[in-house]
Amino acid sequence: MMILVLRLMCGGFWMISYSIAIYKGIKEKSYAMPFFSLCLNISWEMLYFKKVINGGDGGLIWIIIDSIWLILDAGILITYFLYGKKYYPDKLKKYFWGFSIFQLIIAMLIMNEFYTTYPFHAKINAGFFINIVMSM
């Protein structure tokens, strides 16, 4: 029972944080998370979601929570693509889309390599590392 409560609390607090990030991004016409952190996070969410869907721990509750996280990550990603270009130096604005897609691909490759190389508990630690990077 305690694990269920902790999962619900963790899931709920991250959903609140992500929702605030999206709200602030739209309201301030900006984005609320460093982009490379977002790239790593969305990559981790997709890989972990795949694990949860394919019979990993957590059951239905974790599938629902992770699904919502993935959707909210997509919302933050949308705010980046809507408003991020204005923060690029003028000389680099023409590279915004290409460089952004490149970062997403690199983050997915990094997370996939980590995910396929290390045991499951190390993968969870990767999530904690991403949280640290997002907090900087």
Indicate where each model-derived feature is located.
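Alpha-helical membrane-protein topology signature
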Residues: 1-136
